[in-house]
Amino acid sequence: MYVKTERFRPFEKKLWLASPTMHGEELQYVREAYDTNWMSTVGANITAVEQLAAEQAGVKYAVALSSCTAALHLCVKLAGERLYGRPAVGHGTLEGRRVFCSDMTFSATLNPVVYEGGIPVFIDTDGNSWNMSPTALERAFALYPDVKLVVYAELYGFPGNIQKIRQICHAHGAVLIEDAAEAMGAFWADVPCGSFGDYAAVSYNGNKIITGSTGGCLLTNDISDANHARKWSTQARENAAWYQHEEVGYNYRMSNVIAGVIRGQYSHLDEHIAQKKAIYDRYREGL
């Protein structure tokens, strides 16, 4: 809750936590989409972004989507159907079931759980990493042994002890969803973030390490899950010559124009990370 008091005064010059860094190559790919008239939700830019996202995270498949929230929603939906089967029409895949979630994160990490009818159970944060505490997660499983889904956010791009979290999840037969929205390019023990979860999501929002102004990718090693997510994202339209739909779908596909901006940013990912590290070093030295 915001408290108005003289103790808190705004900076004269605003200091941004994150802002877009553009380079110019992005316009080349946007122009290609325009010139070839691939302005909708298919095209070479989307294909390239999916390949780049999968390669960067060290997974087999990526599905380009309109936002990271959309990606997280489809991660949750895939996990729910994997655990509990397809629900009846009008019901979520997690209806009435508890889901362990990070408690220090943006609401987009949790909203998809609620979309699917799940009940978020917040797991305490580790004081050093600001991410989910493995010790608290173990205690939560002792209290609620029937829980089979964990949604873990890598706050500010720091993985926390994701390896230990994954071990705990697998020991309890739980599916792990990795919200790597802020962690693209980060590693834990030389393993890239985005590859630890059974499902993962990355973000291209304007405040992320690379951006398309919006957008996200769902990451998975299962081709059937990738294909199912892609189908859901196109209103779950069946492969027919007419409009045929047999399950609920969503309008979650990425624009080929937006994908052009993202495609042009990928070659600068390491540069952006180096800049972030330099800023961190300056703060650390100053403190």
Please annotate each region the language model reported.
Residues M104-L110:
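Conserved coil-to-alpha-helix start sites within the AMP-binding
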Residues N128-G212, L218-L219, S224:
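Active-site phosphate-binding strand-loop segment of PLP-dependent enzymes
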Residues V42-R98, P112-Y115, F122-D124, V191:
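Phosphate-binding glycine-rich loop
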Residues M1-S40:
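N-terminal "arm"/small-domain region of PLP-dependent enzymes with the aminotransferase-like
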Residues Y34, A183-A189, F196-L287:
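Active-site region of PLP-dependent enzymes
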Residues N111-V113, I168, V257:
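Hydrophobic/aromatic ligand-binding patch that stacks against planar heteroaromatic rings
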